[in-house]
From Swiss-Prot:
Top EC class for this record: transferase
The protein, known as: Ribosomal RNA large subunit methyltransferase K/L
Catalytic activity: guanosine(2445) in 23S rRNA + S-adenosyl-L-methionine = N(2)-methylguanosine(2445) in 23S rRNA + S-adenosyl-L-homocysteine + H(+); guanosine(2069) in 23S rRNA + S-adenosyl-L-methionine = N(2)-methylguanosine(2069) in 23S rRNA + S-adenosyl-L-homocysteine + H(+)
Organism: Acinetobacter baylyi (strain ATCC 33305 / BD413 / ADP1)
Pfam families assigned: Methyltrans_SAM (PF10672), RlmL_1st (PF22020), THUMP (PF02926), UPF0020 (PF01170)
Length: 734
């Protein structure tokens, strides 16, 4: 292999955006000088160097050897490009390149400015090659578009057409191991490029994780890198039928590559983890790993069906970790909001399990990548086929503050003229709630609820932000006086909590009836994540009077989380389905959420996706219905072990059949729901109507136990009428 060889020109093509990385890779293969173009590098080199690129390049798409250039005499608009391509092919003696008994295929690439029917032009190139053979040797080769022995790559340009021998045959991204496919896969060479951009070999991780592994491409490409496995070692190439092929040289290069791989297999490898929520993807990953020749390494690769909500603890399992994944964006997941929730949830998991470790995540839109909590992030834009993708790489930021806001709050003296009583009461409430909030890790709670008649507001804490609701004053109160008092309250709130103005969101709340209870307040959507128990929940303090999380039902949701394991759970009037979310995270066998509003059903799905749970999935474990709850109960027959009903006081929605009044209609609602409750099941019923009384008929036919006191948290003890709640079971249970 050390004998001098004649230098030739070679083109190495790649996906747009990979030129710099490919240039670095070629330098590592001993090719120092390259000319760079969009999607292509050109070098002058030996056949051995071209073979090495075929064997070792993890990033290239094709290796082309220009054979013939046909210069054009005319370039005006009326040119017949297809005929030019025919003439160019005919003008060269192709019998010098391959034998007539060989099969061949044509790949045509036309520069953007040129207008021509590509299919017809490809046929004319084929005609030119065939006619050239007939003139030269009196025989013609056959076409084989599936597995040709020779592939000719033709570039149709403005001033010339270039005819190349494609040494690659098939595109180099086809390593030969992907026998099983999943939706929206990443090409093998793009996966390798991401690993190279992440400087995987320099990181030297002892743990590599792909939590949404699809067909296992990242895991397999990582294995190939760490075992020094040449990507071209076991695949077919396009030079075997070429007259200029040096078979002895190629076999020497193959032997060298095989030896390097065998030596590297003796090295200590990282531990590999491949998870996916789809069992078909798990099977595909396992089969593709075997097809890639790594069956003996399966004991070092943990391949499991897992959702993001079901990650194992990685504590004390690594010193340096690397996480890389291609989430199911776009085609596999659906709407943009759910996509954003998926990336938010993934980011939170990375912060929880892999702080300060490196990660690389693919996104379909840059907005998805922007929610990832990486320090000093890098972004790589590539083309995966015809789809642009963004790769965000960086070091995972640690969680800024994992403790409730009250844990670090202190009751410092404040003076607010005109609102001192209010400031004192707010401070007293916060001091009283602090111990409980820290002990039970409560991040969202009510701090004040019209405790003083002159300050008729509710103050709710969501993480490190405040939601302040001003109850509409009676008509007898001077509006200017009410406005002044409210502004004093805001000043006191800021002084007591220490939170800046931008962390305080203000609403005016009147008694809500019917459709007005969900009136949108503004056009800007500013959802953010809060924690409740195991659940991460999206709340919105700007767009609606309600935030997406009813704080007074916290204790019921946590009770459901404790009781849901292995049970089938039904949530009627589910709103944003936070109770369903708690049930799912608590191990429910299934959850079903029903609400009339498409808006809240979509919000519900985002909450599930945020927590790594699958929605709209083949196994239908978590189902959502935008439907009238009465009609839905009437139409189905499925039985549930645990049911939660938290209906509105009143509704006259256009989607509703008539009107709904909780006092008038609760008997028929509960009867229908109890028909869907399993024999040993439990139904929790709650509502916020202050004058509500449970009808005696319910007590007569079911076992109904009022549990209101058990469902009101310490932050609502000052308002015992915030809601009423019952535990209802079939009579034989007691």
């Amino acid at each position: 292999m050390n004998s001098p060889q004649r230098l030739s020109t070679y083109w190495v093509t790649c996906a747009d955006g990979l030129e710099t990385l490919l240039q670095q890779e070629l330098q590592g293969l001993g090719i120092e000088q390259t000319e760079r173009f969009a999607g292509r590098l050109i070098f002058q080199g030996s056949l051995e160097q071209a073979y090495r690129v075929c064997m070792w390049s993890r990033l290239a798409s094709r290796v082309l050897k220009p054979i013939h250039t046909f210069e054009l005499e005319r370039t005006h608009d009326a040119r017949d490009v297809a005929e030019e391509l025919y003439e160019g092919a005919l003008s060269f003696d192709w019998s010098l390149i391959f034998a007539p008994q060989s099969t061949f295929a044509i790949r045509l690439h036309v520069e953007r400015e040129i207008k021509v029917n590509s299919q017809f032009a490809t046929l004319r190139v084929k005609d030119g090659v065939v006619d050239s053979f007939m003139e030269a040797v009196g025989r013609r080769p056959s076409i084989d578009t599936k597995q040709p022995e020779i592939t000719l790559f033709v570039l149709a340009g403005k001033t010339e057409h270039t005819y190349c021998l494609d040494l690659s045959g098939d595109s180099l991204h086809k390593r030969g191991y992907r026998h099983y496919m999943t939706d929206a896969p990443i090409k093998e060479n793009l996966a390798a490029a991401i690993l190279q951009k992440a400087k995987l070999t320099e990181l030297k991780p002892d743990l590599i994780l792909d939590p949404m592994c699809g067909s296992g491409t990242f895991i397999i490409e990582s294995l190939m890198i760490f075992t020094d496995r040449a990507p071209g070692l076991v695949r077919r190439f396009g030079f075997n039928g070429w007259h200029g092929h040096d078979r002895e040289l190629w076999l020497e290069l193959k032997a060298e590559a095989a030896e390097r791989h065998e030596i590297a297999l003796q090295n200590t490898l990282p531990k590999f983890y491949a998870f996916d929520a789809d069992w078909e993807a798990v099977k595909a990953t396992r089969q593709n790993i075997i097809a890639a020749g790594f069956e003996k390494l399966l004991d070092q690769i943990q391949i499991e069906e897992r959702t993001l909500a079901d990650w194992p603890s990685f504590e004390n399992t690594y010193n340096t970790a690397f996480v890389v994944t291609n989430p199911p964006y776009g085609e596999r997941l659906g709407d943009k909001a759910s996509n954003r929730a998926l990336y938010l949830g993934l980011s939170a998991l990375l912060q929880q399990y892999f702080p300060k470790q490196h990660a690389a995540v693919i996104a379909a839109q840059i907005e998805q990548a922007d929610v990832l909590a990486f320090s000093e992030p890098e972004t790589l834009r590539l083309m995966n086929g015809k789809l642009p993708i963004y790769i965000r790489l960086g070091q995972v930021k640690p969680v800024a503050n994992s403790q409730p806001f009250l844990a670090n709050w202190h009751a410092d003296p404040v003076e607010i003229e005109g609102a001192q009583d209010f400031a004192n009461r707010l401070q007293k409430n916060m001091s009283a709630l602090k111990k409980w909030a820290v002990k039970d890790q409560v991040f969202c709670l009510r701090l004040y609820d019209a405790d003083l008649p002159d300050f008729n507001v509710a103050v709710d804490l969501y993480g490190d932000r405040l939601h302040v609701q001003e109850y509409a004053p009676p008509k007898t109160i001077d509006p200017e006086k009410a406005k002044k008092r409210f502004n004093l309250a805001l000043a006191a709130i800021r002084a007591v909590t220490g939170l800046p103005r931008e962390a305080i969101f203000i609403k005016t709340r009147a008694r809500q009836e019917g459709k007005n209870q969900y009136t949108k307040q503004s056009t800007a959507s500013k959802r953010f994540i809060v924690q409740e128990g195991q659940a991460k929940i999206l709340v919105n303090l700007t767009d609606y009077l309600d935030t997406g999380l009813f704080l007074d039902h916290r204790q019921i949701r946590l009770r459901i989380a404790q009781e849901a394991r292995g049970k089938h759970f039904l949530n009627l009037f589910s709103y944003t389905s936070t109770a369903s979310l708690h049930a799912a995270l608590g191990g429910a066998a299934s959850t079903t959420s029903v609400d009339l509003s498409n808006t809240y059903i979509n919000w519900s799905k985002e909450n599930f996706v945020l927590n790594g749970l699958t929605v709209d999935h083949a196994d239908e474990q978590h189902m959502f219905f935008a439907s009238d709850c009465f009609e839905w109960l009437k139409e189905g027959h499925e039985q549930y072990d645990l049911i939660f009903i938290d209906p509105p006081t009143f509704s006259n929605s256009k989607k509703f059949y008539g009107t709904f009044d909780i006092q008038r209609d609760h008997v028929s609602l509960l009867k229908r729901a109890m028909n869907r409750l399993s024999a040993e099941g439990t139904l929790y019923f709650s509502n916020n109507y202050r004058g509500f009384e449970l009808d005696e008929e319910i007590d007569a036919i079911f076992y109904a136990q009022e549990i209101t006191n058990d469902t009101i948290g310490p932050d609502f003890k000052r308002n015992q009428k915030i809601h009423r709640a019952w535990k209802i079971q079939h009579p034989h249970m007691n």
